Amino acid sequence: MNKQKNNRERTPQPEQDTERDEQLTNSHENDIDSAPAAEENDKVADPVEQLTAQLAALNDTHLRLMAEYDNYRKRTLKEKSELIRNGGEKVLVDLLPVIDDFERALSNLGDMSEPAAIKEGVELIYSKFMDYLQKQGVKKIETADLPFDADLCDAVAMIPAPSAEQKGKVIDCVKTGYTLNDKVIRHAHVVVGE
């Protein structure tokens, strides 16, 4: 009898089969119904993910550009400071031969008994120095017997003019003025006739 009882339990009952079929059908329908909802969520999630990725990429690009700009700014600041610090190097190197000439003249002063030779040596040094200044764009401001020009000259004294023609003109230059590429770098100090 036990065998029969076991057989009955093993053989599925038609009622149980229909219940199982209904459950499977219902779960399958639920899956089908939830599939469009999941697709809609994916569609909504995709743009959000895309925008998030795009935002991250833009932030990364922004940070890189800011770092690059900061490095550029630091590099140019360093270059400018080096130019300011070492900008006069060429000028000073070119002046060294003039200093050498002065040193030679000073060392030979004791041996020279002729003032004409000393004068000639100093004139050579002066000429060499003035040539160098002209190559750099430095020029003397000519003032002799010219009308007083306040843009180029500073009047340090006014004296009675020796003649009527010299009234308002430069009579003497106390300190020579210079221009660098047509810009006054030192005004001439002059005596003007009144």
Curated annotation (Swiss-Prot):
Stretches with biased composition (Basic and acidic residues): 1-12
Region described as Disordered: 1-44
Induction profile: Low level background expression highly induced by oxidative stress due to hydrogen peroxide.
GO cellular component, one term: cytoplasm
Keywords: Chaperone, Cytoplasm, Stress response
Main function: Participates actively in the response to hyperosmotic and heat shock by preventing the aggregation of stress-denatured proteins, in association with DnaK and GrpE. It is the nucleotide exchange factor for DnaK and may function as a thermosensor. Unfolded proteins bind initially to DnaJ; upon interaction with the DnaJ-bound protein, DnaK hydrolyzes its bound ATP, resulting in the formation of a stable complex. GrpE releases ADP from DnaK; ATP binding to DnaK triggers the release of the substrate protein, thus completing the reaction cycle.
Protein name, as recorded: Protein GrpE
Organism encoding this protein: Porphyromonas gingivalis (strain ATCC BAA-308 / W83)
Native organism taxonomy: Bacteria, Pseudomonadati, Bacteroidota, Bacteroidia, Bacteroidales
